[in-house]
Amino acid sequence: LIDLLTDSGTSAMSSNQWAGIMQGDESYAGSPSFFRFEESVRSITGMPLIIPTHQGRAAEKIIFTILGGKGKYFLSNTLFDTTRANIEFSGAEGIDLICDEGKHPSIPAPFKGNMDIVALQQTITKIGAENIPMVIITITNNSGGGQPVSMQNIKAVRNICAEYQIPFFIDACRFAENAYFIKLREEGYSNKTNLEIANEIFSYADGCTMSAKKDAFANIGGFLAMRDLELAIQCRNLLIVTEGFTTYGGLAGRDLEAIAIGLQEIMDEHYLQYRIRSIEYLTNKLIEAGVPVMQPAGGHAVYIDAKEFLPHI
């Protein structure tokens, strides 16, 4: 099956997820399904404060409503479209700082999703750290062709954020593919498990947003995860107004169960190998047919260079 628009919410759920759906607890507050969801997210992110939302853009709406506003700037490798929209809706501005390799679709490089570290430093100096509420790394870089970000780049961004005391968040929609690319392409990680690599990625972040419609295979859902209790309290207060109570966040208990299970299943190396090789297979076939595409193949989709392919439009 090829979906020409998105992989968001279109994945086939596993038999375990469907079984979990049948066990979903629909209690309004304190549902056991929430606590299973919470533990699953914590096991990957290591973050203590977990806030469910009905999908990723709802998590973005909450965090940027609180931290955004006129005169504020959010820096990223490349912001996804809903992320940018929520930033701009708050009155703030989003700035993309993609690395040079990511600007050339047809030239292969192992980590074309990286942030330009020099540009990050220069932009912080120019704008002022006090005007930057957050730096965001999107993994994999969706709007940049599903390209991965290296662990070295994540650490470098983290170090700069720490120097200027700017919160560092991860847009984690496709963290599992990114972890697997690090395992395949980055020195020192070939013998580590995907979970170990994911744990390390999140250890450098102050928080994350995620749409669970991608790497959790779910048809709906998302979450915020963070370490800052004061910020989490503000997010939960807004969640109650816009999404629902803090233990369901606009989701049914059955969806929380499906997400909890999916987050564990995505870490299966055999599945990730199948997924990424499938994308690679289609990418290579298109290259053989003379179709200009983003190279190398990304983790979740084949990106056609439409400007090159259809220059007359």
Please place each PLM-identified region on the residue numbering.
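Conserved PLP-enzyme active-site core in the AAT-like
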Residues: D3-M13, Q17, E26-I50, H54-V291, ...
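Conserved PLP-binding catalytic core of the aspartate aminotransferase-like
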Residues: V293-I313
